[in-house]
């Protein structure tokens, strides 16, 4: 429960020292041995792809073509969209002076626009991000790209037709529809005003001091 702060508990910090979701524990890891915890979505997807033999080419050229787009998303689209959403949507609930948000909003929304162009250009010559096969590059990027119109403006899709085609195509995949249904079920309960205020305080005002105790407890039993 992200809104409830489960990611700051010592048990979770033992798995994910950066107190962020997602994280997994494989009790039957590649190569055997004890249970293997993995955090960061890109690392998780790469591991699962290797374990299952799916969504990641085995030849070096194909593999690294995919991985470069996985890392591109992790370093660019995800962080920039997170920051853009913070300044454009959540910041207004925190900042006393709206003018404090103007630079951050312009900076990060502009960067999301630029990154949309990067994807659109790549998808003009490829069915998927790393070529003509659906891979973990698409899996890790789509959840962010799907929300670009909502973040900026739905009319922006006219500027990125190849990106829109890709977003819609992946949205229709059975596994994606199934996953989205799970997410919708989890998010059905509406928070009270006090719960929403506490959630914002928890998620958007993080410091080392807030998680120091849990981190020290996790380190003792590591």
Residue ranges and their predicted role:
Residues 1-106, 116, 210-222:
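GST-like domain detector, emphasizing the conserved glutathione-binding G-site
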Residues 3, 136, 183-186:
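Short, solvent-exposed turn/loop segments enriched in Gly/Ser/Thr/Pro and often Arg
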Residues 43, 174-175:
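Alpha-helix/helix-capping structural signal
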Residues 69-174, 220-222:
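GST-like fold's C-terminal all-alpha helical module
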Residues 180:
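Segments of small-molecule ligand-sensing domains
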Residues 183-222:
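Acidic/histidine-enriched, glycine/proline-rich intrinsically disordered or flexible terminal extensions
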């Amino acid at each position: 429960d992200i809104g409830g702060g489960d990611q700051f508990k010592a048990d979770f910090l033992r798995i994910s020292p950066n107190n962020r979701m997602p994280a997994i524990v494989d009790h039957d890891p590649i190569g055997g041995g004890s249970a293997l915890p993995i955090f960061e979505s890109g690392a998780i997807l790469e591991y699962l792809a290797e374990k299952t033999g799916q969504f990641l080419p085995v030849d070096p050229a194909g593999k690294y073509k995919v991985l470069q787009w996985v890392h591109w998303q992790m370093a660019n689209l995800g962080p920039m969209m997170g920051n853009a959403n913070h300044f454009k949507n959540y910041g207004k609930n925190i900042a006393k002076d709206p003018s404090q948000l103007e630079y951050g909003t312009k900076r990060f929304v502009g960067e999301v626009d630029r990154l949309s162009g990067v994807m659109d250009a790549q998808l003009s010559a490829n069915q998927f991000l790393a070529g003509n096969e659906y891979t973990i590059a698409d899996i890790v990027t789509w959840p962010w790209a799907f929300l670009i119109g909502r973040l900026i403006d739905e009319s922006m899709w006219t500027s990125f037709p190849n990106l829109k085609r890709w977003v819609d195509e992946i949205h229709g995949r059975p596994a994606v529809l199934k996953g989205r249904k799970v997410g919708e079920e989890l998010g059905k309960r509406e928070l009270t005003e006090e719960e929403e205020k506490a959630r914002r305080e928890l998620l958007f005002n993080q410091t080392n001091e807030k998680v120091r105790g849990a981190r020290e407890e996790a380190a003792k039993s590591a």
